[in-house]
């Protein structure tokens, strides 16, 4: 990511100094930059002090861009360069950092007159080179100074030409929005993986046939211009060759590269990726129901520890997924699956945006959800034009909408796709397929729109053992009433 950013800024015309804890990484970047015609100069450094001094005198302020693993590594680098920082310098932290840690660094830097901006960067290393989606958050003066540069660098919305970057808000808001972006991404990734599995293992479709289907979904309709469908179709077509990719992978005389990929997602288990986990924790702590995002994350966790999973499989002896027995009409199945995937994608967006809205209110950030959707229109993993076209007009301009299901068009779409969602869940469950995100979306719609939940019984039991209190149905001020403890308690079993 850091290398791609360096190339991109040099191409814009900036002189770029680079440094890394591992000097080998610097040398690799410099080697890659040879014989290029970038407008700006790229200079590498082994010594961190010489690196920081190389920027002196070139501008009134030094601008640093971090592309560093979250947590202690970024703190360590800040400690290394702090003595060379001067009042007015700006640090852009482009890592996937926890927003609270960002705010802690902002306080440290504020004392020495330095601005620390939490810069969410989305789109993977390809977009980092050609134009990512950016979500900067921090003090307004520093943001105003760097925005012209970020607007040059950011991806551009194909429809409007607007750069996919905006001032998110103060403090850690930029990294919070990027965290939620990654949470939405997790829900969508799981949904599409589940759909692929249903098509391949459930309906016996080949990879290229599924690629054709994904391409058709991406071409038009509610799932149009969706990044994950785009790359999903692309990777499904990649076959092994005698040469492979030139780096030792994908070597073979036939078959698909996808068959070389084990079912292990380890970025969560080994702590190299924290944003999906933080999204789940934030949704729980801020009382936002986000089951599609959460259960997608939990399947990733289970996938990572394959050793343990294989042992559990021996103990549970649960049937493996089998060909789908229901819905014999394959075209009807595809239509239902299209609607179910769309519903789960849309629910992922609803859950993420509701989390941002709640955090913005809690923290006083004044985030415009419409601008979040605007910067997600290009350069990022959750790009989905059809969904953005539904949501963005309804939430732009801080209209105070905190529950996305209040939006008429959103409610209509979730209502319309509900029967297909149910059909897919029933067919998949009957044939023992893995559908955590899709099934969680179905339950989400059921209980989010439920008028008589089984929690009535739960509330009574909690009152029984803990005197938690309850509200009375049909009583003004209690039904529906505020989210607060009920005034009634019944002595179900008097203490003796």
Curated annotation (Swiss-Prot):
Domain of life: Eukaryota
Magnesium among keywords: no
Cysteines paired by S-S bonds: none
Residues reported to bind substrate: 96, 122-124, 181-182, 300, 468
Start and end residues of each stretch annotated as Disordered: 476-496
Pathway in which the depicted protein is active: Carbohydrate degradation; pentose phosphate pathway; D-ribulose 5-phosphate from D-glucose 6-phosphate (oxidative stage): step 3/3
Principal location listed in the UniProt entry: cytoplasm
Record localization: Cytoplasm
Residues at which NADP(+) binds: 13-18, 24-26, 68-70, 96
Record's keyword terms, sorted: Cytoplasm, Gluconate utilization, NADP, Oxidoreductase, Pentose shunt
Cellular component terms per the entry's GO annotation: cytosol
Catalytic activity: 6-phospho-D-gluconate + NADP(+) = D-ribulose 5-phosphate + CO2 + NADPH
UniProt protein name: 6-phosphogluconate dehydrogenase, decarboxylating
């Amino acid at each position: 990511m850091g290398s791609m950013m360096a190339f991109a800024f040099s191409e814009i015309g900036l002189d770029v100094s680079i440094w890394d804890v591992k000097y080998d990484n610097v040398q690799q970047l410099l080697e890659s930059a040879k014989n290029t015609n970038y407008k700006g100069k790229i200079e590498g450094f082994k010594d961190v002090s010489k690196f920081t001094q190389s920027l002196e005198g070139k501008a009134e302020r030094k601008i640093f861009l971090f592309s560093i693993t979250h947590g202690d590594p970024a703190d360590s680098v800040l400690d290394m360069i702090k003595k060379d920082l001067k009042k007015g310098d700006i640090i852009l932290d482009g890592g996937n950092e926890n927003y609270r840690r960002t705010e802690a660094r902002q306080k440290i830097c504020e004392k020495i007159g330095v601005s620390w901006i939490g810069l969410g960067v989305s789109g993977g290393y390809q977009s980092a080179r050609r134009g990512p989606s950016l979500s900067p958050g921090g003090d307004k003066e520093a943001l105003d100074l760097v925005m012209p540069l970020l607007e040059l660098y950011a991806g551009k919305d194909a429809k409007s030409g607007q750069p996919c970057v905006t001032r998110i808000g103060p403090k850690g808001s930029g990294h919070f929005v990027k965290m939620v972006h990654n949470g939405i991404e997790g829900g969508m990734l799981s949904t599409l993986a589940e759909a692929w599995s249903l098509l391949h293992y459930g309906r016996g479709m080949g990879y290229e046939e599924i690629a054709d289907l994904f391409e058709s979904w991406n071409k038009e309709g509610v799932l149009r211009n969706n990044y994950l469908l785009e790359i999903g179709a692309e990777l499904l077509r990649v076959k092994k060759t005698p040469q492979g990719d030139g780096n030792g992978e994908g070597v073979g005389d036939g078959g698909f590269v996808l068959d070389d990929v084990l079912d292990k997602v380890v970025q969560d288990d080994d702590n190299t990726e924290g944003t999906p986990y933080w999204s789940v924790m934030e949704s729980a702590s801020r009382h936002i129901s986000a089951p599609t995002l959460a259960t997608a994350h939990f399947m990733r966790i289970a996938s990572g520890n394959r050793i343990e999973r294989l042992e559990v499989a021996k103990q549970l002896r649960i049937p493996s997924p089998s060909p789908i027995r229901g819905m014999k009409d394959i075209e009807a199945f595809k239509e239902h699956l299209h609607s179910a995937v769309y519903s789960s994608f849309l629910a992922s967006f609803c859950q993420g945006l509701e989390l941002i809205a709640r955090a913005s209110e809690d923290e006083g950030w004044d985030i415009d959800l419409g601008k979040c959707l605007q910067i997600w229109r290009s350069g990022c993993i959750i790009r989905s034009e059809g969904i953005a076209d539904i949501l963005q007009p309804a939430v732009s301009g801080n209209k105070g909408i905190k529950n996305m299901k209040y939006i008429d068009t959103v409610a209509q779409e979730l209502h319309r796709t509900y029967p297909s969602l149910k059909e897919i869940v029933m067919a998949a469950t009957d044939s023992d397929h893995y559908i955590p995100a899709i099934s969680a979306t179905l339950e989400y719609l059921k209980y989010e729109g439920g008028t008589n939940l089984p929690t009535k019984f739960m509330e009574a039991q909690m009152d029984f053992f803990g005197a938690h209190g309850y509200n009375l149905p049909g009583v003004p001020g209690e039904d529906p009433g505020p989210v607060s403890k009920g005034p009634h308690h019944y002595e179900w079993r008097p203490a003796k």
